[in-house]
């Protein structure tokens, strides 16, 4: 049997990854797209505070016509003034509960045709499932998941009917707790994991209408809601969550808006989030053949890293549990 020439091996080594890149460039779907923001209508739910308000500021500063929806009329008025003061842009405000489909539909109809829809509302309480009342669980899922269905369903007919307006976008703000379950977040994680299935199925349904879905995964973010939640979250939840650090709302909003404009299906906001997205990409669509290449070649090592994270978390839970039983 003839020996394999070292020169042939040197030739073969780059051919394999280049061939894989060529294949991925042919098969990645949906195809790359750019979503313009300037002079377009951005409608943001949960827009009166936190990430939603930061996104509204950014959209307005980039020349969008901005509408924000939230429950509190007084907070909406404060948000409107802060955006106008910072950007000079007049913002439309709508007071409605996302659990009320009729109220949401009325607000969206009044706001006019939407080009960039950002579904951002969210509620969370960190405590063990056994300590949640059925009403707590229902409220979390109704706002975070059912509310997202309500907003998208209300906006979709007019978005699909758009003619000659360029590519549109529907973005859902999830959480890193929507990629991996975290102690104390059983109800919250369930509500955010549901957005993954919604986004994947929705992208298939609206791609022929030139509508592009983005799923955003922020880490802990320094919002008023997060500050309140930290006061009551279990100690072990804080230990696990610390592995991904925290970010400011403006940082998250920039990452999110950049991802929306790039038409990315998945948007991670920090390095730990990027690793988490690689670990949990599964059947998610991917527009970039370079990122698809990275997902393929790092699948094994990333799984090993994920197992080390799980080991560390379970050790923390074990240690914390022992202190509670003493």
From Swiss-Prot:
Residue ranges for motif GXSXG? 46-50
Q: How does it sit in the membrane?
A: Multi-pass membrane protein
Residues annotated as catalytic: 174, 188, 192
Name the Enzyme Commission number(s) assigned to this protein.
1.1.1.102
Establish whether keyword Protein biosynthesis is in the entry. Answer: no
SUPFAM superfamilies xrefs:
NAD(P)-binding Rossmann-fold domains (SSF51735)
Q: Name one GO cellular component term.
A: endoplasmic reticulum membrane
Q: Which residues lie on this side of the membrane: Lumenal?
A: 1-7, 286-288
The entry marks the following residues as binding NADP(+), namely 188, 192
Recorded superkingdom: Eukaryota
Query: Where in the cell?
Result: Endoplasmic reticulum membrane
Q: Which Pfam families match?
A: adh_short
Write out the transmembrane intervals.
8-28, 265-285, 289-309
Gene Ontology biological-process entries: 3-keto-sphinganine metabolic process; sphingolipid biosynthetic process
Q: Which pathway, metabolic or otherwise, does it act in?
A: Lipid metabolism; sphingolipid metabolism
Q: Which residues bind NADPH?
A: 46, 48-50, 71, 75, 97
Q: What happens when the gene is disrupted?
A: High frequency of tricotyledons and altered flower morphology. The double mutants tsc10a and tsc10b are not viable.
Catalyzed reactions: sphinganine + NADP(+) = 3-oxosphinganine + NADPH + H(+)
Topological domain ranges for the Cytoplasmic compartment: 29-264, 310-326
Single GO term (MF): 3-dehydrosphinganine reductase activity
The tissues in which it is expressed are:
Expressed in roots, leaves, stems, flowers and siliques.
State the UniProt keywords alphabetically. Endoplasmic reticulum, Lipid metabolism, Membrane, NADP, Nucleotide-binding, Oxidoreductase, Sphingolipid metabolism, Transmembrane, Transmembrane helix
The family classification in the record reads: Belongs to the short-chain dehydrogenases/reductases (SDR) family.
Q: What does this protein do?
A: Catalyzes the reduction of 3'-oxosphinganine (3-ketodihydrosphingosine/KDS) to sphinganine (dihydrosphingosine/DHS), the second step of de novo sphingolipid biosynthesis. In plants, sphingolipids seems to play a critical role in mineral ion homeostasis, most likely through their involvement in the ion transport functionalities of membrane systems in the root. Lacks stereospecificity and can also produce L-threo-DHS in addition to D-erythro-DHS.
Q: Which named protein is this?
A: 3-dehydrosphinganine reductase TSC10A
Which species is this record about? Arabidopsis thaliana
Question: Gene name, please?
Answer: TSC10A
